[in-house]
A protein has these predicted regions:
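Accessory interaction regions appended to the cores of large information-processing enzymes
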Residues: 2-167
Length: 167
């Protein structure tokens, strides 16, 4: 029933494209302070020999592109532009791993089709870390070390401080 709803909403062409992707679910969690971050995503990748219109995608690096496939409806959480930028930033940080996986002359498209999180317990850098974790799981490389600590002095409820320098 859920798949039928998605098919009807996405339309035939989007559903056919989505079937070609290799999908992977991932859950990023961080709990080191008074509150935690939890982000669940489903993202996928597709290798292709050509991309018809690169303007429909965000370029991550040479031959690697991103697109959001999150259906726009009241049932789905939508990411703001800055949240998508942070997600893509995570993919850019580890793009060298994609190039190891990608055959020469091919393109890699990464798509995000579902995301869930509590707007009360999320911080924008969490989207960066979430993208890195998803990629490490989907492409089977070791999760890079992301340092994070909770700074209770940041008003009003504390803030996580992330260090991506070792990524």
């Amino acid at each position: 029933l859920f798949l039928i709803h998605k098919m009807a909403f996405w339309g035939g062409e989007d559903m056919v494209r989505a079937k070609d992707y290799t999908w992977q679910k991932s859950r990023y969690t961080l709990l080191k302070g008074r509150w935690g971050i939890a982000i669940w995503i489903e993202a996928g990748y597709l290798m292709t020999s050509e991309i018809e219109d690169k303007n429909n995608y965000t370029e991550i690096s040479d031959h690697i592109y991103f697109e959001s496939m999150i259906p726009s409806s009241s049932d789905n959480i939508q990411l703001y532009a800055d949240e998508l930028l942070h997600f893509c930033s995570g993919l850019k940080m580890i793009s060298r791993h994609f190039h190891e996986f990608l055959p020469e002359g091919m393109y890699l498209i990464i798509a995000l089709r579902n995301i869930e999180f509590s707007e009360c317990y999320v911080q924008i850098e969490g989207f960066t870390a979430c993208a890195i974790q998803w990629a490490s799981e989907a492409f089977h490389f070791s999760m890079p070390k992301i340092e994070a600590y909770f700074d209770e002095s940041k008003a009003p409820n504390g803030q996580y401080i992330f260090d991506f320098s070792s990524v």
